[in-house]
């Protein structure tokens, strides 16, 4: 009887080992099969710093005139510092702990190239802090950093208690435009005078609490500026509709909220009020009004043949937006998931895209403007959660993570 019990235990142990092995083989293995190679470099420096664990989630990257790619980070998992770094695709160099100079800022949310090869950035903080007025968050700052001198300058707070979600610069006219978070106000900043202008609420965001975490949906994630100085963005139209008399319930609401999403608006230079362009972001029918999804523009880049390439949040579509004619041309999608969160041109002339849900595998896709083909290349590594891509001076695609200990993958396209 004792031997039978021992045999049964060994059999159960064998089944557990077999099950775990099958599960491991059943998991998706990360791989990008095309191109010359894929390697990665670590952003965080470990316990010794200066970029500690929890401070290396990458928020943006831009290629500067000195040939280096500069990136920004945000704090995660309760960490408090955000940083600027730069890389040549071989190693990462820390250049600035921004929180040590502007206290209370835990995220550099966006970067732009300013006049004179100066970096312009904006800041924000944790959603939990923005959700609690008692935390006393002073507000998101604009700042500048000069790579040639290593000097940074605080350009001030835009809105008390509000972070800054995204910015874009009109270099010809010396203007910066941005969107506050979570209030969703469009604003401008004049570099010469230092004055700001609040154009008011362009999106009434809805507060979402998922698994105990608070966030706000619908706030524009990207701004586009054309040569005429006109600013474009996507937003929702929200209105309250009265219930019919027979629909009213005792003690219940007399109205319901209706949303119309993915509307592309423009603010012409010198105007005070944005207007609807008449076109909307491509979406699956019926999803434009669903509050569970964000139907908007996740990413945008100037197209080399005119207009802007844009990636959508809700469906992961790639589309071309022509501001001069208010035309949208949908190119479709090449993967199952959604959220084309970042775009970059590679050295081979193709448009590369980063897609995927915020807390899931990140996929690399490419669009060939010569053939019109969209292909899914795979993902850097199983469970790699990436936030942004950027081409370096060699035309390689840098793919950056937004985790506690983040890596940058360096992908070299085929010629």
Residue ranges and their predicted role:
Residues 47-81:
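Beta-strand-rich domains and repeat architectures in extracellular enzymes and scaffolds
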Residues 55-60, 103-111, 162-168, 207-212, ...:
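Repeated scaffold domains used in trafficking and secretory/extracellular systems
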Residues 63-66, 113-116, 169-173, 225-228, ...:
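Residue-level detector of Asp-centered blade-edge/turn motifs that repeat once per structural unit
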Residues 384-415:
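Blade-level signature of beta-propeller repeat domains, shared across WD40, Kelch, NHL, RCC1
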């Amino acid at each position: 009887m004792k031997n039978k019990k021992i045999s049964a235990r060994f059999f159960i142990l064998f089944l557990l080992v077999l099950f775990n092995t099958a599960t491991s083989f059943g998991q998706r293995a990360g791989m990008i099969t095309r191109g010359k190679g894929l390697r990665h470099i670590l952003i965080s420096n470990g316990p010794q710093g200066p970029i500690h664990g929890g401070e290396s989630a990458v928020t943006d990257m831009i290629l500067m005139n000195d040939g280096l790619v500069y990136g920004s980070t945000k704090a995660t998992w309760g960490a408090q510092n955000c940083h600027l770094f730069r890389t040549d695709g071989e190693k990462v160099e820390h250049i600035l702990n921004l929180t040590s100079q502007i206290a209370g800022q835990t995220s550099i949310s966006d970067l732009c190239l300013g006049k004179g090869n100066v970096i312009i950035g904006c800041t924000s903080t944790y959603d939990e802090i923005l959700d609690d007025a008692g935390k006393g968050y002073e507000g998101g700052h604009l700042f500048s950093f000069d790579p040639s001198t290593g000097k940074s300058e605080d350009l001030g707070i835009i809105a008390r208690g509000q972070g800054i979600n995204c910015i874009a610069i009109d270099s010809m006219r010396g203007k910066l435009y941005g969107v506050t978070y979570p209030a969703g106000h469009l604003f401008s900043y004049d570099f010469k005078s230092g004055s700001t202008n609040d154009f008011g609420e362009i999106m009434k965001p809805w507060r979402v609490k998922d698994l105990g975490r608070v966030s706000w949906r619908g706030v524009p994630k990207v701004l586009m500026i054309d040569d005429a100085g006109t600013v474009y963005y996507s937003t929702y139209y929200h209105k309250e509709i009265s219930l019919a008399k027979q629909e009213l319930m005792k003690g219940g609401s007399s109205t319901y909220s209706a949303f119309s999403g993915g509307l592309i608006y423009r603010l012409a230079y010198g105007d005070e009020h944005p207007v609807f362009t008449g076109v909307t972001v491509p979406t699956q029918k019926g999803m434009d009004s669903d509050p569970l999804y964000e139907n908007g523009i996740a990413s945008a880049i100037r197209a080399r043949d005119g207009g802007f390439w844009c990636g959508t949040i809700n469906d992961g579509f790639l589309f071309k937006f022509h501001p001069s004619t208010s035309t949208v041309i949908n190119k479709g999608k090449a993967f199952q998931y959604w959220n084309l969160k970042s775009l970059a041109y590679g050295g081979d002339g193709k448009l590369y895209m980063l897609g995927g849900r915020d807390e899931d595998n990140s996929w690399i896709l490419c669009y060939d403007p010569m053939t019109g083909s969209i292909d899914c290349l795979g993902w850097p590594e199983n469970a790699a959660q990436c936030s942004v891509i950027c081409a370096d001076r060699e035309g390689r695609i840098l793919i950056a993570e937004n985790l506690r200990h983040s890596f940058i993958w360096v992908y070299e396209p085929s010629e």
